[in-house]
């Protein structure tokens, strides 16, 4: 059985992506260290994909190749997929867009996870992790089953994300749709890679 640890950086980016487009579905990829710690996969970064056309398209294929190359340079691996459904009440895998992308990732990384943003927990008073994590345990018989996860420095991360949401930090996040509209915009969102405490000084 595999469980997951989600870094503050990865969590902040995927939450900011969902918060930037609250009335649209969004999706993205999750990156992890190449070597897992025992049965734990540590998700260290998130790369926002799309908020317009979320399905497997030529542009999605290009994005996957670019992100794979980026991960390789950073010593990371594509280890998961995240999605925020458009419908407020949908928080299950079968209700999320472009699940085939998650299936494709799982073919290449057997311990891949599928993170679903729980819209009901997406509030400015961010006191609980607004995600559910799923994986494909080989012995369960289920395609995607709920998995255990921990949020790195949970209390500080939730407090920091909450404060940054209130200050509008999500407006500066760049996804691949934004990058395609303006190639000068950086889809790696390097400015979000600093600790949340330091990031708060910018807003």
Curated annotation (Swiss-Prot):
GO terms for cellular component: EMC complex; endomembrane system. InterPro entries: EMC8/9 (IPR005366), MPN (IPR037518). It is found in: Endoplasmic reticulum membrane. Belongs to the EMC8/EMC9 family. Component of the ER membrane protein complex (EMC). PANTHER family: ER MEMBRANE PROTEIN COMPLEX, ER MEMBRANE PROTEIN COMPLEX SUBUNIT 8_9 HOMOLOG. This is ER membrane protein complex subunit 8/9 homolog. It comes from Drosophila melanogaster (Fruit fly).
